[in-house]
């Protein structure tokens, strides 16, 4: 059943940030591939240069139907301080209807959700299905842009469903319609080519720190909204 399947996934120590667990991340990807291959989907494990293994899969594509991409990730965070755990992180335990173990929620549950939905609807799917289960989300998906660039066709879809969010509260099914994004970059501010005394610099002619602080302060309005 669902609990048994999720438990088997949780037992795999797919810690993407730990080089000592590279084999476990590979094993986790293989597990996910086998899952969807068992449903008859076309599946692949793909790893771009410097990246962790991701699984892509798809049903037979009917051009007359819309295509839905189901996203999740199979890697997990390190366990941290073991003294803070009441159970062994990779020995899943079912207590009062909840499964405890590293990745039981984030995000191996998401993989199992996608698997069971496809399994239930497979004989009469109203849409084309593509699957993307990455293996480096917990380290910031450093090769995501390269992966997308190299596998655009495998990820092409009209809608994306991400099984990696949270419920409003336990037991209440929840659909999240927006998620925070992430943008990084560099801001360079020129300053005098030689040191100046703090009592002499700044003021009418602002120094680099003043300019940079104003730029950063302009990112949000008084209510915290991005501008």
Show where each model-derived region lies.
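Acidic/His- and Gly-rich active-site-bordering loop/insert found
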Residues: 1-102, 121-126
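Predominant activation on well-ordered alpha-helical scaffold segments within soluble catalytic domains
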Residues: 7, 33, 112-115, 119, ...
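Generic secondary-structure signature for well-ordered alpha-helical cores
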Residues: 11, 37, 123, 152-153, ...
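Short small-residue beta-strand/loop micro-motif enriched in glycine and branched aliphatics
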Residues: 100-101, 193-199
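Acidic/histidine-rich catalytic neighborhood of metal-dependent amide-processing enzymes
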Residues: 103-178
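Flexible glycine/proline-rich, aromatic-decorated loop/lid segments
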Residues: 174-190
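Acidic-enriched catalytic cores of C-N bond-cleaving enzymes acting on peptides and small amides
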Residues: 198-227
């Amino acid at each position: 059943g669902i609990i048994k399947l999720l438990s088997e996934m949780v037992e795999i120590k797919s810690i993407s940030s730990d080089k000592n667990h590279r084999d476990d991340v590979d094993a986790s990807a293989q597990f996910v591939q086998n899952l969807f291959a068992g449903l008859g989907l076309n599946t692949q494990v793909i790893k771009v240069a410097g990246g962790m293994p991701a699984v892509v899969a798809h049903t037979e594509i009917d051009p007359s139907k819309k295509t839905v991409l189901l996203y999740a990730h199979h890697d997990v965070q390190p366990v941290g301080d073991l003294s803070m755990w009441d159970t062994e992180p990779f020995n899943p335990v079912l207590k009062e209807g909840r499964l405890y173990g590293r990745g039981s929620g984030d995000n191996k549950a998401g993989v199992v959700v996608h698997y069971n939905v496809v399994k239930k609807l497979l004989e009469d799917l109203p849409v084309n299905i593509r699957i993307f289960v990455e293996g480096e989300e917990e380290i910031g998906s450093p090769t995501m842009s390269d992966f997308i660039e190299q596998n655009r066709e495998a990820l092409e879809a009209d809608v994306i469903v991400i099984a990696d969010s949270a419920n409003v509260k336990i037991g209440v099914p929840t659909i999240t319609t927006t998620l925070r994004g992430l943008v990084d970059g560099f801001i360079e501010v020129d300053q005098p080519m030689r040191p100046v005394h703090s009592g002499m610099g700044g003021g009418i002619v602002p120094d680099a720190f003043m300019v940079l602080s104003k730029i950063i302060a302009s990112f949000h309005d008084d209510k915290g909204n991005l501008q």
